[in-house]
Amino acid sequence: MKSELQLRRRDLALLEALALRVRLIGQRQAADAFWHGHCANARRRLGQLASNGMLTRNLVNAQPLPEIIEPVVRWQPGQVAPDAGHVAYQVQHRWKFRALRPTVVYFPTVKTISQFGGSERSQTKLTQITYDLGVTAIWLRYASQNNNTTAMWIGEDILAPTRIREKLPDAALVDQQGQPKLLIEFAGSYGPERIADFHDDAAARGLPYHLW
């Protein structure tokens, strides 16, 4: 009989993030963030977590992410609206010459989502893998700068029930009462109209945002 896997602090941090903060994580992302860049160690441990029903491993096609260092736009109520056309050019230009390539990603299982109090979610579309990896990269960026941010970050799937008939950001940093205090959106390769729509929604609700 297979003995139960003993979860380490690192395992719990990763599983909690996948249940509550982000939808998936790339194997390379996990290695860099949780195993100090040691791919072999990361691959071995992720495989153990998958074998024990906590993660699902998939090989998918995704574009290599551009360097994600800081938001393209930081906006607060009272400031002038960003130039949507200029922002769209910036975010679209960064994807130049980034062809799809095989990428190993890990998803949380229903067991993991339930264990950490996450919300039921629809299956990620293959066409959305690159985008979701971008959201994960943003979360990892915040987490590397401030550990407190990881607890304040609430992902889209957790936010969804509270945003009926409202635009849904990729994530939000929330206060102790669970109210959004900063919206977070990965612009991907958004066009001007979508960027303007996101800004208008945030401005109408008086919420600052970071657009990456």
Model segments located where?
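Short, well-structured alpha-helical interface segments that form or flank functional binding sites
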Residues: 25, 41-44, 129-133, 137, ...
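A short, highly charged nucleic-acid-interacting micro-segment common to nuclease
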Residues: 34-35, 120-135
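Active-site metal-binding core of divalent-cation-utilizing nuclease and nuclease-like domains
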Residues: 58, 73, 78-96, 125-131, ...
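Short, charged, solvent-exposed linker or helix-capping segments at domain edges/interfaces
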Residues: 117-119, 183
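Catalytic cores of nucleic-acid endonucleases
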Residues: 141, 179-182, 186-212
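Nuclease-adjacent, charged terminal/linker segments that flank catalytic cores
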Residues: 1-114
